[in-house]
Amino acid sequence: MRFIHALLLAGIAHSAYASEKLTFKTDLEKLEREKAAQIGVAIVDPQGEIVAGHRTAQRFAMCSTFKFPLAALVFERIDSGTERGDRKLSYGPDMIVEWSPATERFLASGHMTVLEAAQAAVQLSDNGATNLLLREIGGPAAMTQYFRKIGDSVSRLDRKEPEMSDNTLATSEIQLRLLLWHVLWLKSSMAAH
């Protein structure tokens, strides 16, 4: 009798999960129709496995999504001792590009620290700060090398800001998921050993 109860509970749990997945997919498809857009979603567990997703294999324009892994690369360099967070990055008016609020604010002093630039790039999506960081790591090609180093064979960076808003460069939700998982989970689990 316990076995039958266990089977019933498992069946109920499975049908509830399947129903939630159907609702998730249906809701996303409805949102795509309403917004006349395609949406990619990857929900990941702590082991890096996708537990739910929509358009996970489709490529999407990177736009500003590369700023988070760029900051992660900068923090890796700080952690390894090849970079200092308080190091001043000098720049002039030529570094001011479309949407550079923090870079404009620091222009009078002529510099931002590495950490200030990373914070501005991620929190404000500051294009000037992003270009400062790209300059310091060796340019877009160095960012692509970082993608390869962490196992992302799809994503690439060919330009600086604001040209990254051009939708011709792409990554997939799967690759972005792997990238974020590497940065957020893998590093913390490695540090524990």
PLM segments and residue spans:
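Sec-dependent signal peptide recognition
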Residues: M1-L8
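Hydrophobic h-region of N-terminal signal peptides that target proteins for export
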Residues: L9-A18
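Beta-lactamase-like hydrolase cores
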Residues: Y17-A61
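Mid-domain, small-residue-enriched loop/turn segments at the edges of structured enzyme/sensor domains
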Residues: Q38, N131-M190
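Soluble periplasmic/extracytoplasmic beta-strand elements of cell-envelope proteins
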Residues: G40-V44, P69, S90, L132
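Active-site SXXK
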Residues: A61-L89
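Acidic helix-start/capping segments at beta-turn-to-alpha-helix junctions
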Residues: G85-A102, I137-G138, M164
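Conserved catalytic neighborhood of penicillin-recognizing serine enzymes
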Residues: I96-L132, P140
